[in-house]
Amino acid sequence: MDNKSIEEYLGFGSGAVDGLGIGGLLKVRVEDFRVEEVSSIPALDPKGRFTVVRVTLVNWETNRFLKRLSRACGINRNRVFASGLKDKRAITTQLLVIDASQKKIEQVDIADSTIEILGRTHQKIGMSDHDGNRFTLTVRGCCDVDGAPLEGKEAMRRVLDLIEKMSEKLGENIFPNWIGPQRFGSTRPVTPEVGRAVVSGDFEEAVNLYLGMKGLNDGKETDELREMWRVTHDPAKCL
């Protein structure tokens, strides 16, 4: 199974509607991908224990930034609360709640980041507390199927045509939630198979699939281990 057949296996071989695409590349530059978290600011109170901030990050992996921020504030990483992880190669904006004084946070200076203090609160935030994310994408190098460059106006015309067709087929302002192969396993799409077995209550099959399914880039040792599991289902023989 190669990369193309994996995409077809996962159902990525066709579009939601028929129409001409625009080709092109995403994330050529960091500023080509922008993510703005849509969330409500926790109730503010000057006597609150926590500080609420809005951070804008440029090319930062979220967890790495949170660790860097906690060190700068002199606190444990577990005292910095976020609602979600954002793309690294992007400009991202999101809320954080920090268990540190406003004065301490005002002194923080981390490269490629902006920290806007919103106030104090008694409330923490947890994963997925936000309402959603707003994405702004720049597509560069748009081209036709034969590789011929597309003018910006023609590319936009095609995009608007596809949006109109999707509105007719799916409903107004409804857009398919496209999920790339990486969510399923880009070189070993085992996740949907294991999930199907778990949902069916066949946990033994879920384990067999997880351990035994071949991967596109498995090394010799891993490939032999998976084959041994498929043949014997014996952990001792696989070690």
Predicted segment positions?
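Extended, charged/glycine-rich binding lobes that contact polyanionic ligands
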Residues: 1-44, 50, 58-59, 72-73, ...
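Ser/Thr-Pro-rich, acidic low-complexity intrinsically disordered regions of eukaryotic RNA-binding
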Residues: 61-68
